Amino acid sequence: MATATLDKAALSRLFTDYSLEITPKDVEALENAAHMIPPGTLISVTFLPGAEYEDRARAAKRIQELGFRPVPHLSARRLIDEADLRTYLDMLKGVIDLKHVFVIAGDPNEPLGIYEDALALIDSGILKEYGIEHCGISGYPEGHPDITDEKLAKAMHDKVASLKRQGIDYSIMTQFGFDAEPVLEWLKQIRSEGIDGPVRIGLAGPASIKTLLRFAARCGVGTSAKVVKKYGLSITSLIGSAGPDPVIEDLTPVLGPEHGQVHLHFYPFGGLVKTNEWIVNFKGKQGI
């Protein structure tokens, strides 16, 4: 697929301060990709089942050692109680300069402990107590398969209000998607409602079509025939791979002041090295 030529200033703004995400198992891949990543880049550490606190803390420590800024995830429904949360935060403070976290409800349908959702954890006041200065929260431009749009909107406003009361800066990181249109509509909507914090638009790094469609199905991301064709995917053929070029090409010309501060967040489903090679090559082709 040919790369469209985009406005350099607009594209440069979009790529400024982009962020990445890793699992605790990706430390070696991060070391291999580190030379391609700008110093100070925000790199999230997921809170998924199958990893221990020590594994997550070790990954966060390595991120900082490599010159990047670690953003540990806190999955509210996977935490048993306050002591459990403090155990992890204490462990993190012992190995990194803990200033930035990302709080999400998490995937269990029923909480494993006392935190019903992300708001419950934020409202606890523990983040402020531990010196957290910035908290990321989730955004869903295409909605959530298990939560109504009304509940999603209320939850976002409640979390933003709680963080502002506590003097903690916030940003919103969105679910990944293949279509720019719902992202743009959602941005206009939240800005009109007074949500003024930075937004990190989630994009899937280059990956096999099979992998992208699997993650889309798991996350409730739209894969209509029109959307997947434009993205370079095929529902009938799982051969080949695709990258986020089409979404960026659609976003860049139309993002304006009414959309607020916008950055990119890459989910490296096809591998961290592959994602960063794509970023370097894309920026090189565009001359930014």
Swiss-Prot record:
One Pfam family, short name: MTHFR
Q: Which reaction does it catalyse?
A: (6S)-5-methyl-5,6,7,8-tetrahydrofolate + NAD(+) = (6R)-5,10-methylene-5,6,7,8-tetrahydrofolate + NADH + H(+)
* One cellular-component annotation, GO: cytosol
Provide the disulphide bond pattern: none
According to UniProt, this protein's pathway is: One-carbon metabolism; tetrahydrofolate interconversion; Amino-acid biosynthesis; L-methionine biosynthesis via de novo pathway
State if Transcription is listed as a keyword.
no
Positions contributing to (6S)-5-methyl-5,6,7,8-tetrahydrofolate binding: 107, 175
Q: According to the record, what happens upon gene knockout?
A: Mutant cannot grow on vanillate or syringate as the sole source of carbon. Mutant retains vanillate and syringate O-demethylation activity, but accumulates methyl-tetrahydrofolate as a result of the THF-dependent O-demethylation of those compounds.
Organism domain of life: Bacteria
| One GO MF term | FAD binding
Q: What UniProt keywords apply to this chain's record, in alphabetical order?
A: FAD, Flavoprotein, NAD, Oxidoreductase
Entry EC no(s): 1.5.1.54
| Entry binding sites for NADH | 175
Q: Name one GO biological process term.
A: tetrahydrofolate interconversion
Cofactor names from the entry are: FAD
Residues engaged in binding FAD:
51, 73, 106-107, 118, 140, 144, 159
- What is this protein's function per UniProt? Catalyzes the NADH-dependent reduction of 5,10-methylenetetrahydrofolate to 5-methyltetrahydrofolate. Is required to provide the methyl group necessary for methionine synthetase to convert homocysteine to methionine; the methyl group is given by 5-methyltetrahydrofolate. Is required for Sphingobium SYK-6 to grow on vanillate or syringate as the sole source of carbon.
Concerning PANTHER family, the annotation shows: METHYLENETETRAHYDROFOLATE REDUCTASE, METHYLENETETRAHYDROFOLATE REDUCTASE (NADPH)
- Family assignment from sequence similarity: Belongs to the methylenetetrahydrofolate reductase family.
**The protein's name in its UniProt record:** 5,10-methylenetetrahydrofolate reductase
Supply the source organism for this entry. Sphingobium sp. (strain NBRC 103272 / SYK-6)
Whichever gene encodes this chain, its name is metF
